[in-house]
Amino acid sequence: MSQVNMRDMLKAGVHFGHQTRYWNPKMGKYIFGARNKIHIINLEKTLPMFNEALTFVERLASGKNKILFVGTKRSAGKIVAEEAARCGSPYVDHRWLGGMLTNFKTIRQSIKRLRELEVQAEDGTFAKLTKKEALMRTRDLEKLDRSLGGIKDMGGLPDALFVIDVDHERIAITEANKLGIPVIGVVDTNSSPEGVDYIIPGNDDAIRAIQLYMGSMADAVIRGRNNVAGGTDVFVEEAPAAAAVEG
């Protein structure tokens, strides 16, 4: 199991929080102190919590479960899409549509429409339409792809959410909480950790920090899937007990 170390976090600026006047008291126990009116996050607390979250994700992936990556703010979107694609995971990088989880039946219909338009764009249907109609369908396709392209292959509800900036993605977290879907979240000093099952106290704005979180999570998914492909059982400690029962 590959883990993140303190040096990685320091280089990425994970320890830099927000201005002290914007702090959320619920994050007090994760704050080391302040420097130039900026809160400094205690990485001795962040490090084990992040590695615990990575272990959880690796175990989920080894069971062929789906982790939905969510990061829709400008600094996160591109990295979220790239790393999710690298590990073959679903993602939301543009805007969280209300009901994406709690009203998945309706979302599924929109995904079906997206697929129909993709087929029409490829099979020459658009070319047979009037210019106006072709333009309207192209715009529909682009709009649906921007909103739902990252989850079109998800197939059903995810088994966990990984969220960059829990305040920005509060609607997604609330929906996951309602459905009992575990939430892993990067929580900065100005945010509330409520509703987050695996808290990662850290900078949620710096691009290098976001790259570290997302790259590490994608690697954990890939490791978990490789465990399945290679026949490795990450729950190997349970195997003897199971064998004894069968015997």
Curated annotation (Swiss-Prot):
Highest taxon of the lineage: Bacteria
Keywords annotated in UniProt: Ribonucleoprotein, Ribosomal protein
Gene Ontology molecular-function annotations: structural constituent of ribosome
Signal peptide: none
Cellular component aspect of the GO annotation: cytosolic small ribosomal subunit
Single GO biological process annotation from the record: translation
NCBIfam families the record matches: rpsB_bact
PANTHER family on file: 30S RIBOSOMAL PROTEIN S2 PROKARYOTIC AND ORGANELLAR, SMALL RIBOSOMAL SUBUNIT PROTEIN US2M
Family: Belongs to the universal ribosomal protein uS2 family.
Name of the protein this chain belongs to: Small ribosomal subunit protein uS2
The organism's taxonomic lineage, starting at the top: Bacteria, Pseudomonadati, Pseudomonadota, Gammaproteobacteria, Pseudomonadales
Gene name of the encoded protein: rpsB
